[in-house]
Amino acid sequence: DAQESRGLGDVYKRQGENMQKKNCVLCISIGIIVCILLSACSRQPDFDAKSYVQSSLDAHYHGEYKDYANLLEISEKDAKKEIEEDFNESIQQQFDDSDNITDKGIADYAEKLTEVKKLAKYKVQDVKEEDGVYTVSVQVEPSNVFQTLQQSSTEVSNEKIKQGLDGNDPEVFAAVLTESVQKSLEKNRYGKAVTVNVSVEKDNSGKYGLLDTEMNKLEAAMFPTE
């Protein structure tokens, strides 16, 4: 009986050792799978510089916020608010030292310039990456809306003078501004397409974006003043 007990004990011992071996193999296998999954989850997706530039331009100039908001992981409402506030602030700054225009006049002028922005014609093309900096080429068709603005302003001002109106009156001044822009909008023409290269790089927080200087470069090409 004792011998039989020892025999059964050996069997159980071997079974236990086999189970431990299997458990060890299972642990290693699970460990490998977990490592693979963690690696896949922690690996950041490649930044799509082309989509970023396209959606940025669509949002800032054509008022199309969906893709831009998705890339920034914010709501369309917040994206729209952010862009509109920046734009309105830049318009307001133009009149900080001026007393001859009302808030309504500034708002009307800003609304008219929003129409100008929608004239922007661009096509995002090639992307090159080097040392974490993306160079994106954008083909733009320059609008002459600002090139004709001085002439439009002169024409509108002369019309107001003929009507006996005072150009220093805040309402008249605002009317000259908005009507001049409208006049240039109506005779807008596009020039020969040009290619502009802009850089998309990480900011201090590690997020990719277009610096103001790069956006200004694109805007100067789309809406030249000379």
Language model segments and positions:
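Single conserved hydrophobic/aromatic residue that forms the stacking wall/gate
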Residues: 1-15
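Bacterial N-terminal signal peptides that target proteins for export
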Residues: 20-28
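C-terminal motif of bacterial Sec signal peptides marking the signal peptidase cleavage site
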Residues: 37-40
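Core segments of small alpha/beta cavity-forming domains
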Residues: 42-115, 123
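A mature extracytoplasmic/lumenal domain signature
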Residues: 72-75, 126-128, 138-142, 212-216
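Surface-exposed, charged secondary-structure patches
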Residues: 93, 97-171
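Intrinsically disordered, low-complexity acidic Ser/Thr-rich regulatory segments
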Residues: 110, 173-189
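Short beta-strand edge/turn micro-motifs at domain boundaries
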Residues: 156-172, 186-226
